[in-house]
Regions:
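Glycine-/small-residue-rich active-site loops that bind phosphorylated ligands and cofactors
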Residues: 19-20, 83, 106, 132
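Short, well-ordered coil/turn segments that N-cap beta-strands
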Residues: 34, 73, 96, 123-125
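N-terminal Rossmann-like dinucleotide-binding module
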Residues: 1-54
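A contiguous active-site-proximal alpha/beta segment in oxidoreductase catalytic domains
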Residues: 99, 105-145
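Residues that form or flank phosphate/diphosphate-binding pockets in enzymes
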Residues: 22-23, 86, 109, 135
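Beta-loop-alpha module in the N-terminal Rossmann-like domain of NAD(P)-dependent dehydrogenases
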Residues: 43, 57-117
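Active-site phosphate/pyrophosphate- and oxyanion-stabilizing loops and adjacent acidic/basic residues
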Residues: 25-26, 48, 64, 138, ...
């Protein structure tokens, strides 16, 4: 890339399930400013298949090993809910910005620790609440409130 064009964001995905496949990776594939560099899943065959399907150069079974070796700029945490805290904290400790699926954590205390870790690291920690602005959500909100 030229000096005037920034390098693409290097994104790693933790969790190779449906949300990672149909939402995160599908969206990243449409972006010229994003390069998917790694995927991790506790089931290695699922990680490999996901990587092949999306043209991702490496598949991993251990998040910390992946983060150390690949050094992504951003991590999408799409793992099962009970693993969000550990995966988010590992990504922040590795110096990555994080996009985490909902729910952010299993307890308010975990969510607060994640927020503080992001602040201390000077990294963005964002949560994916994309349905908040969907028409059906807005209509339901109006009916309830």
């Amino acid at each position: 890339m030229s000096a005037s064009t920034p390098s693409p964001l290097r994104v790693a995905i933790i969790g190779a399930g449906q949300v990672a496949d149909k939402v995160h990776a599908s969206y990243y594939a449409t972006r010229r400013d994003v390069q998917m560099v790694a995927v991790m899943d506790s089931h290695p065959e699922q990680a490999r298949a996901f990587a092949e399907r999306h043209g991702i150069p490496s598949a991993w079974q251990d998040a910390r090993e992946m983060l150390e070796a690949v050094k992504p700029d951003v991590v999408s945490v799409c793992s099962p809910n009970r693993f969000h805290f550990g995966h988010v904290m590992a990504a922040l400790e590795a110096g990555c910005h994080v996009m985490c699926e909902k729910p952010p954590a299993m307890t308010p205390q975990e969510a607060d620790r994640m927020r503080m870790a992001a602040r201390k690291a000077g990294k963005v920690l964002a949560y994916d609440f994309h349905h908040r602005f969907a028409l059906d959500t807005q209509l339901l909100r109006e009916a309830v409130i």
